[in-house]
């Protein structure tokens, strides 16, 4: 289906990322500076009329951006997910997760999409720019998720972590749905699409549950492997630690967001006439 990726050289991509690892630091610091200073800059640009936030051009840009990311995730999903399921059927779940497979990771069509998935985490930072231009302040979960995924994905790909295939398959699937949802909301269907929001958050939470279980299992295998023995899982100790911390923090934050947004009852608005106050 994608003949142009048959000669994909993931090792070259890995070398490029390792040789330019400082760029990861610049991106992360620049992004955090954008989150910190961006709201004030946008307020000045907006003026009293919100000329930037209310711009029709901005709305169209948001629609196109989200549709592009949804399409990218869809094409990645339809390659990586079947490849991972085939690997499970051939090797079993545990060996599919923990076994080393250079050919699939760096040479196959699935490897191409895994590599592009990792590299896409840098342009995905533009999500935050669009949020700022709409006059919104990015919540902690938003920017924390973006910057940590960028760092973790970069490290995981360069470290050839075997569990990366599952992480990419899950994330591409969720992002295909999520970015399509954002595009439809920007098109003016927010009221219609709003009913699907809890289910998308539930999908994200499910992704974090699976990620937490897998990273915990891989960390257990890595730390219980005797000195000098073959690793029980093709994951480094550094990546195992990063994975556990990242996925468990996501699980907590997304669960908290779900509870606050959909599960906990909204506080009733106080009646101004209640204590004999005039209105």
From Swiss-Prot:
Residues at the active site: 145
Transmembrane segments: 16-36, 61-81, 112-132, 138-158, 164-184, 196-216, 242-262
Cross-referenced InterPro entries: ELO_fam
Alphabetized UniProt keyword annotations: Endoplasmic reticulum, Fatty acid biosynthesis, Fatty acid metabolism, Lipid biosynthesis, Lipid metabolism, Membrane, Transferase, Transmembrane, Transmembrane helix
Gene Ontology terms: biological process: fatty acid elongation, monounsaturated fatty acid; fatty acid elongation, polyunsaturated fatty acid; fatty acid elongation, saturated fatty acid; sphingolipid biosynthetic process; very long-chain fatty acid biosynthetic process
EC number, as in UniProt: 2.3.1.-
Enzyme class: transferase
GO molecular function per UniProt: fatty acid elongase activity
Catalytic reaction equation(s): an acyl-CoA + malonyl-CoA + H(+) = a 3-oxoacyl-CoA + CO2 + CoA
Any coiled-coil regions, as ranges: none
Recorded superkingdom: Eukaryota
Subcellular location: Endoplasmic reticulum membrane
Entry keyword annotation includes Cell inner membrane: no
Membrane topology: Multi-pass membrane protein
Motif (HxxHH motif): 142-146
Disulphide linkage map: none
Protein's pathway: Lipid metabolism; fatty acid biosynthesis
Predominant cellular place of this UniProt entry's protein: endoplasmic reticulum
One Pfam family hit: ELO
Signal peptide (from-to): none
GO cellular component: endoplasmic reticulum membrane
Function description: Involved in the synthesis of fatty acids. Elongates C10 fatty acids to C14. Required for the maintenance of the global lipidome profile in this parasite.
Family: Belongs to the ELO family.
Name this polypeptide is given: Fatty acid elongase 2
Organism, as annotated: Trypanosoma cruzi (strain CL Brener)
Lineage of the species this protein comes from: Eukaryota, Discoba, Euglenozoa, Kinetoplastea, Metakinetoplastina
Gene symbol of the encoding locus: ELO2
